[in-house]
Curated annotation (Swiss-Prot):
EC number: 1.1.1.421
Function: Involved in catabolism of D-apiose. Catalyzes the conversion of D-apionate to 3-oxo-isoapionate.
GO biological process: tyrosine biosynthetic process
Protein origin, superkingdom: Bacteria
Cofactor(s) needed for function: Zn(2+)
Pathway stated in the Swiss-Prot or TrEMBL entry: Carbohydrate metabolism
Family annotation (Pfam families): NAD_binding_2, PGDH_C
Species the sequence originates in: Pectobacterium atrosepticum (strain SCRI 1043 / ATCC BAA-672) (Erwinia carotovora subsp. atroseptica)
Protein name: D-apionate oxidoisomerase
Length: 285
């Protein structure tokens, strides 16, 4: 039987993600300790009505220790935190990069997990102004979570999922994958591809307005509406693209996308981009 997870420590509680997840934990039944080193960030934690704790005092008591710190700091922070954790506790990180790169300090008698929010879907049915305003998730709009807990049993995953659903809530479902699969989801799928395409569309909009001279309101209206229909047709087959549109699509692929672009799904390319993100020379295994 999986041990119940009752006590949680959030390290980096005053950072961007730390503040987001702490706001949800504050409304939960978990016993939560909030730890933050930065004086300015400490002020934010206190201003939000949360009491600061001393990490060295609460880490040994915690069933789950959450590292809400930047990826590039995880090696150093985990090196300090992991030796202080009690046996059978769970170290939970929020991004897969450092775990994939084997930068997290190791101990045989604790568990490791990663949980990352998917953010509310573009296809989500939203019914309230609060849901419409919540683009990031974790406030009002429901979202999914992708997570990895490779050493966990189904029962342990279910227990940790309850923690994850609180911290990122409201949550529709938690999808369990491997650390490597999670790394392919982010950065490869959603940052290397989706976020890159988002910035490309913004650059194209700017070019249309500033170089071609199309009025800004007209350009935005046309693009924003067509983003919606392009996604609906491509992902949900609501209607087929017209023959003329397909010609324009192929022209765009030929002129914008490299023929070998799918190499980004090669493992060596995943290693390369994550090494760049973590500011390390290479990933060692």
């Amino acid at each position: 039987m999986a041990a119940e997870l009752k006590t949680i420590t959030v390290l980096g509680a005053g950072g961007k993600m730390g503040m987001r997840i702490s706001a949800n934990f504050q409304k939960s039944d978990y016993q939560v300790f909030y730890c933050e080193n930065s004086p300015r960030a400490q002020e934010q934690v206190v201003a939000a009505g949360r009491e600061l704790s001393i990490a060295e005092q609460v880490i040994p008591e915690s069933d789950v220790v959450i590292l809400a710190v930047p990826d590039i700091a995880l090696k150093a922070v985990s090196g300090i935190v992991v030796p202080q954790m009690k046996s059978n506790a769970v170290l939970l990180t929020l991004d897969p990069a450092a775990a994939y790169a084997n930068l997290i300090a190791k101990r045989d008698d604790i568990d490791y997990a990663v949980a990352h929010p998917c953010h509310p879907s573009v296809f989500l049915d939203r019914f309230t102004p609060e849901e419409h305003a919540d683009a990031f998730g974790g406030v009002a709009a429901p979202q999914h979570v992708a997570a990895s807990y490779e050493t966990g049993s189904d029962e342990q995953k279910a227990t940790l999922a309850r923690v994850v659903k609180v911290m990122y809530g409201p949550v529709i479902d938690v999808h369990w994958v491997t650390v490597k699969q999670l790394a392919y989801l982010e950065p490869t799928l959603v940052e290397t591809v989706a976020c890159m395409v988002g910035t490309l569309m913004k650059e194209a909009l700017d070019e249309t307005i500033n170089t071609i001279g199309v009025p800004e309101a007209a350009a935005k209206a046309m693009l924003y509406g067509h983003i919606q229909i392009a996604l609906a047709v491509a992902f949900r087959s609501t209607n087929p693209f017209s023959d003329a549109c397909m010609i324009a699509i192929e022209y765009g692929k030929e002129n914008i996308i490299k023929p070998d672009w799918k190499k980004i799904f090669d493992e060596k390319e995943l290693d390369l981009v994550i090494a760049k993100m973590l500011k390390i020379d290479a990933i060692e295994r």
